[in-house]
Regions:
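Acidic, metal/ion-coordinating pockets
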Residues: 19-355
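Bacterial N-terminal signal peptides that target proteins for export
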Residues: 1-7
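Hydrophobic h-region of N-terminal signal peptides that target proteins for export
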Residues: 12-19
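Alpha-helical protein-protein interaction elements
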Residues: 9-11, 36
Length: 355
């Protein structure tokens, strides 16, 4: 009997140890995110150019990897549309090396057999709250974990609601309830938690205020152009991704101490850049000290003093940030050369559809 108790004690200890995340003190990782692609394989025409296209996206990511960066590639949902090019998208995403796809409302409504697409994918389809209507069981993996430089990230998929033309086979669980349940479990298994959310921006704000334990939230369903904004007072950083794959969102995170909070410095960097450009314009190409240049102009001297004080404050705040997050939005213009392998996959997929 005593040996049985000892065995159970050992097994319990192993389970507890295996479910607890290892401690990491420093490192960095970068998300590259898309969403609302809506079946777009090729560039989207605009007035004077074209934007997007999977061949350009692949080229950008190859260049990024060649620089020594190993990005985490995420799609927040609404990848597929009604056109029969879904398998071509999956093949391209496999070749590019995506890490996870959140299944959005349009993805379920616009695909005949999503389980076949999931089998063809070399990356997980995730959703914590899309369930089988009959059993209430999840249709997809609720989350996936990814490690970069010793830092463990949990990626959770959530969708706010399904479309009316979705299969009666599927139902939806309250995203807040599903998110809270997962975040509680994943807190001890990961260093940071990321929510891929499919829904409107207003829906995302409500979800963010309820799921304050998460660190990042990437939203599909909102089609506005992504912009750098002030971070929220509480809850995860919320990032939009645009639509049709016309651009890529990058979120670069540098961790000096996992026990310290994250700080989005995107707006601070923009502020510092703007102030430096202003001072450069005031100098007018001269190498003379600004104070000497405007010594006889009291109002201008006071303005320069205020500007330099603002610059000093911005630089102090940047220097004092322990764990930093930097958002960027990169349009995929025609200046980016098409990747030949992705072009071949798209052409082959187009031929197959026409047969």
């Amino acid at each position: 009997m005593k040996y049985s108790k000892l065995f159970l004690t050992i097994i319990s200890g192993v389970l507890i140890f295996s479910c607890t995340k290892p401690r990491t003190t420093a490192g960095e990782f970068i998300f590259v995110a898309t969403g609302n692609v809506q079946g777009s394989l090729k560039p989207y025409k605009i007035r004077l150019d074209s934007l997007g296209g999977l061949p350009r996206r692949a080229t950008f990511l190859k260049d990024l990897r060649s620089s020594g960066t190993d990005p985490i590639l995420l799609d927040a949902g609404n990848l597929f549309n009604e056109q029969d090019n879904s398998i071509g998208l999956i093949k391209c995403y496999n070749e590019i090396g995506y890490d996870a796809l959140n299944i959005g409302a349009q993805d379920l409504a616009n695909t005949i057999n999503i389980s076949n697409l999931e089998k063809a994918a070399e990356f997980p389809f995730i959703s914590a709250n899309i369930v089988h209507m009959r059993t209430g069981e999840p249709v997809f993996k609720p989350f996936t974990t990814i490690e970069r430089n010793g830092i463990i990230l949990a990626i959770i998929g959530l969708t706010n609601n399904l479309l009316d033309n979705s299969s009666v086979e599927y139902g939806i669980k309250d995203p807040i309830q599903a998110g809270k349940e997962l975040l509680e479990i994943l807190a001890n298994q990961s260093d940071y938690q990321v929510i891929l959310f499919n829904g409107s921006f207003d829906d995302a704000v409500v979800i963010r205020e309820a799921l304050v334990e998460a660190d990042f939230m990437i939203i599909s369903g909102h089609t506005g152009v992504p912009r750098k904004t002030q971070p929220p007072e509480k809850g995860p950083f919320l990032y939009k991704v645009g639509e049709f794959g016309r651009a890529l969102v990058t979120i670069k995170t540098r961790i000096a101490n996992t026990d310290s909070s994250l700080k989005d410095i995107s707006m601070l960097i923009e502020r510092e850049k703007f102030i430096k450009e202003t001072l450069h314009l005031l100098r007018g190409g001269s190498s003379m000290n600004l104070e000497k240049m405007y010594a006889g102009n009291y109002d201008m001297s006071q303005r320069i003093k205020r500007i330099k004080t603002e610059l000093e404050f911005a630089q102090i705040e940047l220097a004092s940030a322990t764990n930093t997050v930097e958002f960027d939005f990169i349009p995929l213009s025609s200046s980016i050369i098409d990747d030949v392998d992705i072009k071949r996959i798209i052409n082959e997929a187009s031929i197959a559809v026409k047969k």
